[in-house]
A protein has these predicted regions:
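Extended, low-hydrophobicity, polar/charged segments
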Residues: 1-162
Length: 162
């Protein structure tokens, strides 16, 4: 179970309610540092740090994409898989409106709005993942099975090397 000193974010509330076994990982946040900074600060492989990306389709419907920290999303391939013309990243303001989180502190847990979640398939085979806990400078770690149990993401293969 989580330590009592966890920040109380909507993500942490959902993780506790779902009885997810997670560990806190606070780190010094750097503006525009991304997953390379969090991986470095925590001493973990960037491939195991999962970024939460808020995107929208050509009908302006939002969706969540979970991707390895060292990969980018092929939006063209994602659009093809989900059957839309295009998928694009949301603006920071739009992402915050849908999730309730600031960019850099976006978690797929406890979002303001329910959205479909697409997860890069390779995330499921990792031993442990590190994902944002709903605050800048705060990741939580868990097994991919816990994430899958709670979010029930749709597996996709859309990751590309930057």
């Amino acid at each position: 179970m989580a330590k009592e000193k966890s920040p109380v974010t909507p993500a942490v509330r959902q993780l506790r309610a779902e009885k997810v076994d997670f560990t806190d990982h606070p780190y010094p946040y750097e503006e525009k540092g991304g997953t390379s900074v969090s991986a470095r600060e925590l001493g973990v492989d960037e491939h195991c740090v999962v970024k939460t990306l808020i995107m929208e389709d050509d009908h302006k419907e939002p969706l969540i994409v979970l991707m390895h920290g060292d990969r980018q999303v092929s939006t063209k391939e994602l659009a093809r898989i989900i059957g839309v013309k295009q998928v694009n990243p949301c603006t920071p303001d739009t992402a915050q409106k849908h999730t309730g989180y600031l960019v850099g502190g976006t978690s797929p847990f406890g979002t303001r709005r329910q959205m479909p979640v697409y997860m890069e398939a390779g995330i499921a085979v990792l031993e442990r993942i590190y994902i944002n806990g709903g605050k800048r400078g705060y990741l939580v770690s868990m097994t991919p099975d816990e994430l899958i149990r709670v979010l029930q993401p749709i597996p996709v293969t859309v990751g590309i090397q930057p």
